């Protein structure tokens, strides 16, 4: 459904949105001041000496209020200049292994592995390396027994086992057997 309205209101709304959005992106070129090595386009005075203030406040010089950023977080959130401390025992071991003329094979073993690798077993009670041997079968019919080529007809089972659905007939048949 298309709603028609006053074109003057639509143009005024469009101009208001355009000027509101472009106002936050104006750059302020500062003359002097403390930039702390930052570029002049990024000087909003939000962080000085590692202490940051909220960026939603209006700066008094420019009158620009910085908006909230809903995009992805940019930059690293952790200090990258921290030195990794090496355990002195490991450092001593590395120095011993690093001596010239000595050949070592280093194998790394993971310390905390949560999942253990499982061994595939094709049949219960048999390992994957074992082969099926004919003498393992308890009955010779296990080996030679094949599935019938056609499905059996209803009611014809070859050793006949009475079904519980037959009710009284199953009791009389079981007495005869």
Curated annotation (Swiss-Prot):
<comment type="similarity">
    <text>Belongs to the pyrokinin family.</text>
</comment>
<feature type="modified residue" description="Leucine amide">
    <location>
        <position position="124"/>
    </location>
</feature>
<protein>
    <recommendedName>
        <fullName>PBAN-type neuropeptides</fullName>
    </recommendedName>
</protein>
<feature type="modified residue" description="Leucine amide">
    <location>
        <position position="166"/>
    </location>
</feature>
<feature type="propeptide">
    <location>
        <begin position="24"/>
        <end position="54"/>
    </location>
</feature>
<comment type="function">
    <text>Pyrokinins mediate visceral muscle contractile activity (myotropic activity).</text>
</comment>
<keyword id="KW-0027">Amidation</keyword>
<feature type="propeptide">
    <location>
        <begin position="169"/>
        <end position="177"/>
    </location>
</feature>
<feature type="propeptide">
    <location>
        <begin position="78"/>
        <end position="113"/>
    </location>
</feature>
<keyword id="KW-0964">Secreted</keyword>
<keyword id="KW-0165">Cleavage on pair of basic residues</keyword>
<dbReference type="GO" id="GO:0007218">
    <property type="term" value="P:neuropeptide signaling pathway"/>
</dbReference>
<feature type="region of interest" description="Disordered">
    <location>
        <begin position="28"/>
        <end position="73"/>
    </location>
</feature>
<feature type="compositionally biased region" description="Polar residues">
    <location>
        <begin position="31"/>
        <end position="45"/>
    </location>
</feature>
<dbReference type="GO" id="GO:0005576">
    <property type="term" value="C:extracellular region"/>
</dbReference>
<feature type="compositionally biased region" description="Low complexity">
    <location>
        <begin position="47"/>
        <end position="59"/>
    </location>
</feature>
<keyword id="KW-0732">Signal</keyword>
<feature type="modified residue" description="Leucine amide">
    <location>
        <position position="154"/>
    </location>
</feature>
<feature type="signal peptide">
    <location>
        <begin position="1"/>
        <end position="23"/>
    </location>
</feature>
<feature type="modified residue" description="Leucine amide">
    <location>
        <position position="74"/>
    </location>
</feature>
<keyword id="KW-0527">Neuropeptide</keyword>
